[in-house]
């Protein structure tokens, strides 16, 4: 049976753990609010751009661009698909990273010509441990996105697409539904499809 000293030590240990947990909760809440604010600022811009492209396509329906070229001459099994995978930089994120890894592995099963472009430390560690080749590593933290980082990623992907090193580009990331709910989103980026733009 534990003596009084051992019981006091355990109580102190539990109290210390509670303090650490509360501190982690406060930090997480602050980061979540910041991320939500960034999302609220960015989403209107994204949808405005989508609608603007839709209006252009309405007035120039026969516009030719390599970005709209579906490359029908390439068989589905021969298409080279680039997957941009966005993961977290740290663990302790519940199913956040796990769900992304699961979706990526499902995609890789159906495509033998896949290339991985990974953003985030957890993704890099996971795929390296699995022995999967990462085509190009973007050494950026996922939690601090910026326009210049997005531009660097875009330039690399577009270069490979225009050089026909890639036939399709897909992004896999976590979409925030509300303050507590998220889901893994798989979005087809290239080639563009006119019907996907709001007109």
Regions found by a protein language model. Give the residues of each.
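Conserved loop-to-helix interface motifs that mediate assembly, gating, or partner/ligand docking
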Residues: 2-199
């Amino acid at each position: 049976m534990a003596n009084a000293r051992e019981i006091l030590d355990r109580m102190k240990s539990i109290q210390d753990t509670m303090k650490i947990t509360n501190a982690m909760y406060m930090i997480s809440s602050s980061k979540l609010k910041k991320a939500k604010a960034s999302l609220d600022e960015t989403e209107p811009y994204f949808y405005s751009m989508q609608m603007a492209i839709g209006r252009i396509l309405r007035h120039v329906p026969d516009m030719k661009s390599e970005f709209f070229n579906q490359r029908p001459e390439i068989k589905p099994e021969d298409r080279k698909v680039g997957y941009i995978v966005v993961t977290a930089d740290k663990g302790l994120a519940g199913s956040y990273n796990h769900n992304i890894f699961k979706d990526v592995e499902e995609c890789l099963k159906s495509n033998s010509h896949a290339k991985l472009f990974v953003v985030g430390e957890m993704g890099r560690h996971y795929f390296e441990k699995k022995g999967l080749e990462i085509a190009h590593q973007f050494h950026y933290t996922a939690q601090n996105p910026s326009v210049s980082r997005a531009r660097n990623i875009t330039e690399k992907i577009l270069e490979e697409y225009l050089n026909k090193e890639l036939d399709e580009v897909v992004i896999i990331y976590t979409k925030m539904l509300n303050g507590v709910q998220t889901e893994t989103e798989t979005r087809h980026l290239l080639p563009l499809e006119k019907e996907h733009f709001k007109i």
